[in-house]
Amino acid sequence: MARFTNCLLKNIFTRSQFDSAKRRQCLQYLNALRSLQHNGYKTVYFGETEIPETLVTGEDFSDSYYIHTPSWCILHAGGSQGWVPWKYRMFLRNDLCIKKEDSLFLEFCDVVKRAYGKCAIVVKGRRQQDEMKPKTDKEGEAKAYVPTSINLTSIACSPGVAKSYGHELISLPPYYNYLNPLDSAWSSMKWFIINNRKEFCLQSVDNVYTYRYILFSDLISKGIEKVNLTKWKAITNKVRRWENYYLAKFS
């Protein structure tokens, strides 16, 4: 019984420390973001999403264990001003295993500099333990997490590149998905694909086969276009309310 109690207490303490670290990281992120906004930085959320072929075709291969369907990675950015006036990129996921596009983040930083001036670029990366190092003051207290690099599937986002254009790169804290409006924008785009894919499909029939052609690029472009400025303002306002909630709760 004593052994069981000790294990239970150890689990409680470990979970408590983990929750405390999460809250601290969230508060550091929010304080850093608000400080940049106060100093005139525009907030831009930069990220990617995956579009599997089955989402576009509507085919169901859930019972086929050995069928690997291709998927695409879409890279874009937005904020309270709507989608950033930068041409989104679309990659076949298998190609990304061979080569990443190293120049894209530099190009992106240049575009947002011209469009908005200095920006706080918020990225939700594929976080690893050694990607984030705490910045400490003289007393050794962690103040804000400074990313050495934020890795996405398609590119690596460098804080040095961001700074060279007058921007600041911030990593979105994990476990707080409500703080990322880009997730809601991707979700709206995917629902548009599901509900309208038949309208972007052409069919051809010969003596033996029936062929189906999907206007994939047009479908994606229209789905992105449907997440208009009004929707962006709504989802960024919702994120702002969550930010205020977490600031009040964790401060």
UniProtKB/Swiss-Prot annotation:
It comes from the Eukaryota. InterPro entries: C21orf140-like. Belongs to the FAM243 family. This is Uncharacterized protein C21orf140 homolog. The lineage of its organism: Eukaryota, Metazoa, Chordata, Craniata, Vertebrata.
